[in-house]
């Protein structure tokens, strides 16, 4: 019987395509991964400006009065405002809609066009937000930012997975998540310094500064080539063959090119990719496209990264200290993501998922205990001793590092690499849509939940971390070292998913199961 969850490739009948990690493909993937900057910058910048007094006074005066009132006796509820929540969460609803539209554009016109749309729309949103004079302008700008993120997040992970040699796909794809973390860090640093600008207009620089990462991905999408997979899908066979040789750095690409053509021919037989997603043989893929982004958001990470300054201010750090603490967590996020780049193709996806889950679970429980011990259930305000603040920040940083080398990058990598070409664009849109929907939900209810659940909010998220770790252990196959167009084979050997997939669905052979889900050394 197959080992629980593990579907490692073997050296037997697994195809091995020749190719190297060339400078060309490395530079191409690095430029494309810059699409993550816009998402990361927004996550970092928005939470920071909502902790700036000048921003709150101009757009959310009721929140500012509540925050400053001496009679306030509940630290947990000082930021509870539906208007403030709508400012932060409207972006994700727009991103959800855009990701569905992006599926058709990505499939019919190529990955890079969707990346271009993402950059242009995000740039427009940044201009409106930086010049905002009323709340409606802020929300309009956020909606345009969301459209940009929806297009970029749908296309960039696909681009990276298709462009990278299969042996290095994990590391190159995680460049997208690394760019997200760099965007968060840069935003946190800028917030810290812009908040000190006299006159209270630093928030305009923070919001308007989003133009910079938007211009990077816009220009990048104009100079990048499209992927061989996308070229073949659109009938550009000769260009695709020549491009594949350059990408792989070898002349012998016949076998891989032939397999890509066959995959494209199969995909053209599919008239309705959205409807095809519901077929029984795609049940495993669809389950992962829904479960992974759902669980990723229920780790609570966007609560930490998006609302970090607000959260730290709430638990007694003060405004400047809160912004600096957010910078510290941003630094941890970047360096921990680099660990994932090193380890994802060495240790595998499942190991990182499970280790990160255990780490996050322990840290959330400790943070909940620390906050509960300090503020209790009534949220009574008071100064936070320095040593206490250090302990809270330390365990939040350990929590962030656990996410940064597991659910952060793998939440984008695994869904983008498991889909066959005929449903890949549609399935990636499902993945992004689910991600954005639950990001919207969490952002919409977080401040309310903080007010009512208090320190129990961290217990709430830790429960889902436990559930998602169990899910990964039993239901997620190992996808390390498998060519992207061969990925369907892993489901045939899985102890559970094999009941939905038959030999006729993937007629080109199978993959053998290793003991205890371990990957043989010859991979």
From Swiss-Prot:
Protein name as it appears in the record: Sugar carrier protein C
Cytoplasmic topological domain residue ranges = 1-25, 477-523
Keyword Transmembrane helix part of the UniProt annotation: yes
GO (cellular component) term, any one: membrane
- Fetch the NCBIfam families from UniProt: SP
Q: Which PANTHER family match?
A: SOLUTE CARRIER FAMILY 2, FACILITATED GLUCOSE TRANSPORTER, SUGAR TRANSPORT PROTEIN 1
Q: Does the keyword Iron apply?
A: no
Tell me which family the UniProt entry assigns to this protein.
Belongs to the major facilitator superfamily. Sugar transporter (TC 2.A.1.1) family.
Q: Which UniProt keywords apply?
A: Membrane, Sugar transport, Symport, Transmembrane, Transmembrane helix, Transport
What gene does this protein come from?
Answer: STC
Q: Where in or outside the cell is it found?
A: Membrane
Species lineage = Eukaryota, Viridiplantae, Streptophyta, Embryophyta, Tracheophyta
Its topology with respect to the membrane?
A: Multi-pass membrane protein
């Amino acid at each position: 019987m197959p080992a629980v969850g593990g579907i490692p490739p073997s050296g037997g009948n697994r195809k091995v395509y020749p190719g190297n990690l060339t400078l060309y493909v490395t530079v191409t993937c690095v430029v494309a991964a810059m699409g993550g900057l816009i998402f990361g910058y927004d996550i970092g910048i928005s939470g920071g400006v909502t902790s700036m007094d000048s921003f709150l006074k101009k757009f959310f005066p009721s929140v500012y009065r509540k925050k400053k009132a001496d009679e306030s006796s509940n630290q947990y509820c000082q930021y509870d405002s539906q208007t403030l929540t709508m400012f932060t969460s409207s972006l994700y609803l727009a991103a959800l809609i855009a990701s569905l539209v992006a599926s058709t554009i990505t499939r019919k016109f190529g990955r890079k066009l969707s990346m271009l749309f993402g950059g242009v729309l995000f740039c427009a949103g940044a201009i409106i937000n930086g010049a905002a004079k009323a709340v409606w302008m802020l929300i309009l700008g956020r909606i345009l930012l969301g459209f940009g993120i929806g297009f970029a997040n749908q296309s960039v992970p696909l681009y990276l997975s298709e462009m990278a040699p299969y042996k290095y796909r994990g590391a190159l794809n995680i460049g997208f998540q690394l760019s997200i973390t760099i965007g968060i860090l840069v935003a946190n640093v800028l917030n810290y310094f812009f908040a000190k600008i006299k006159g209270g207009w630093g928030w305009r620089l923070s919001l308007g500064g989003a133009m910079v990462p938007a211009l990077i991905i816009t220009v990048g999408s104009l100079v990048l080539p499209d992927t061989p997979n996308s070229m073949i899908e659109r009938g550009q066979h000769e260009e695709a063959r020549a491009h594949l040789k350059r990408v792989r750095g070898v002349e012998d690409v016949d076998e891989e090119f032939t397999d890509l053509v066959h995959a494209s021919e199969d995909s053209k037989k599919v008239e309705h990719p959205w409807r095809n997603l519901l077929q029984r043989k795609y049940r495993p893929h669809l389950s992962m496209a829904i479960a992974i982004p759902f669980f990723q958001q229920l780790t609570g990470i966007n609560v930490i990264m998006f609302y970090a300054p607000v959260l730290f201010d709430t638990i007694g750090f003060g405004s400047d200290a809160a912004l600096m603490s957010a910078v510290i967590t941003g630094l941890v996020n970047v360096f921990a993501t680099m660990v994932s780049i090193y380890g994802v193709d060495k240790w595998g996806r499942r190991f990182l998922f499970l280790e990160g889950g255990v780490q996050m679970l322990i840290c959330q429980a400790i943070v909940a205990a620390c906050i509960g011990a300090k503020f209790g259930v009534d949220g009574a305000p008071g100064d936070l001793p320095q040593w206490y603040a250090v302990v809270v920040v330390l365990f939040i940083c350990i929590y962030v590092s656990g996410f940064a080398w597991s659910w952060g990058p793998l939440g984008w990598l695994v869904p983008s690499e498991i889909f066959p070409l005929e449903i890949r664009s549609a399935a990636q849109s499902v993945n992004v849509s689910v991600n954005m929907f639950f990001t919207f939900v969490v952002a919409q209810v977080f401040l309310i939940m903080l007010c009512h659940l208090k320190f129990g909010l961290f217990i709430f998220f830790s429960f889902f971390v436990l559930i998602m770790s169990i899910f990964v252990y039993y239901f997620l196959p190992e996808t390390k070292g498998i060519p992207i167009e061969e990925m369907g084979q892993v489901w045939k050997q899985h102890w559970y998913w094999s009941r939905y997939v038959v030999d006729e669905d993937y007629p080109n052979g199978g993959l053998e199961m290793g003991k205890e889900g371990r990957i043989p050394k010859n991979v």
